[in-house]
């Protein structure tokens, strides 16, 4: 059966796995900024955040350290906690 949201699930699982294995940092004292995509690669799943998508920037002390799709941010945040 076709699942129209399967790509979001794949992104989520890929990001969750990368946090669990230490490929993505665990951060303390971060802020989140949400924007329309800048067309850069998502640090979570490795796919480009498309022009029509929202991009979450994770900021630590004024430096953007992660750029993530919304579903990738959720995966990172769940494992981070």
Describe each model-derived feature in a short phrase.
Residues 42-46:
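Short cysteine-rich clusters marking metal-coordination/redox-active sites
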Residues 51-55, 78:
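Short, non-ligating residues that shape and space the ligands of small metal-coordination modules
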Residues 8-28:
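Short, charged low-complexity linear segments at domain edges
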Residues 27-40:
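Short, flexible, mixed-charge glycine/proline-rich loop motifs
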Residues 22-29, 59, 75-80:
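Non-catalytic localization and substrate-recognition regions of ubiquitin/SUMO ligases
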Residues 11, 66-81:
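Short metal-binding segments enriched for Cys and/or His
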Residues 56-67:
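Short linker/helix segments within small regulatory modules
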């Amino acid at each position: 059966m076709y699942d129209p949201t399967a790509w979001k699930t794949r992104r989520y699982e890929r990001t969750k796995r990368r946090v669990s294995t230490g490929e993505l940092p665990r951060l303390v004292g971060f802020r989140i900024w949400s924007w329309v995509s800048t067309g850069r690669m998502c640090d979570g799943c490795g796919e480009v955040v498309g022009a029509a998508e929202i991009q979450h920037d994770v900021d630590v002390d004024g430096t953007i350290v992660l750029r993530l799709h919304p579903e990738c941010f959720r995966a990172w945040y769940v494992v981070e906690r």
